[in-house]
């Protein structure tokens, strides 16, 4: 079966308990794809091909399989670096370095998050920049900064 449209996010579905749910585990970078093949916890395989280019996949994207049946995407947790710069100068240094490495990042609440990378860890340690390693389940894929939007 090929699924072409996201029904809604599982968190936004009323009476979710009345549905039979199959879950497919996906990597965070799979969320950027318009065409995807998944295998569920029930052993079923489905193809996903989004017809609408404006639709995006995210953690919890649900597809209708039947009247009371859903396929829900669940993102596998990634090992992430979460950087907390002390001031604007440190933020600039980190942003410059990550930009030169062409790393996709997520910036939220004054913190920069990116996938685990040993080169980045060495740079952060060398410059005594605060960071934590965390296992994070991303809601949306990390993206490269796009100044055209």
Curated annotation (Swiss-Prot):
Family the entry assigns: Belongs to the UreE family.
Major place of residence: cytoplasm
Gene3D superfamilies recorded: Urease metallochaperone UreE, N-terminal domain (2.60.260.20), UreE, C-terminal domain (3.30.70.790)
Coiled-coil segments on the chain, per record: none
InterPro entries xrefs: UreE, UreE_C_dom, UreE_N, UreE_N_sf
Name the record gives this protein: Urease accessory protein UreE
Localization: Cytoplasm
Assigned GO CC terms: cytoplasm
Source species: Limosilactobacillus fermentum (Lactobacillus fermentum)
GO BP: any one term: urea metabolic process
CDD domains attached to this UniProt entry: UreE
Alphabetical keyword list: Chaperone, Cytoplasm, Nickel, Nickel insertion
GO terms, molecular function: nickel cation binding; unfolded protein binding
A family per Pfam: UreE_N
Annotated function: Involved in urease metallocenter assembly. Binds nickel. Probably functions as a nickel donor during metallocenter assembly.
């Amino acid at each position: 079966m090929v699924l072409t449209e996201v029904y809604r996010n599982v968190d936004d579905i009323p009476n979710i308990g009345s549905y039979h749910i199959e879950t497919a585990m996906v990597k965070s970078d799979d969320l950027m794809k318009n065409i995807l093949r998944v295998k569920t916890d029930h052993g079923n395989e489905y193809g996903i091909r989004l017809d609408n280019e404006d639709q995006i996949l995210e953690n919890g994207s649900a597809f209708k399989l039947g009247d009371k049946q859903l396929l829900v995407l669940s993102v596998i947790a990634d090992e992430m670096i979460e950087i907390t710069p002390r001031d604007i100068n440190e933020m600039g240094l980190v942003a410059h370095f990550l930009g030169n490495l062409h790393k996709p990042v997520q910036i939220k609440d004054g913190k920069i998050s990116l996938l685990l990378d040993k080169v980045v860890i060495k740079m952060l340690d060398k410059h005594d920049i605060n960071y934590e390693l965390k296992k994070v389940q991303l809601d949306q894929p990390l993206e490269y900064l796009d100044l055209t939007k």
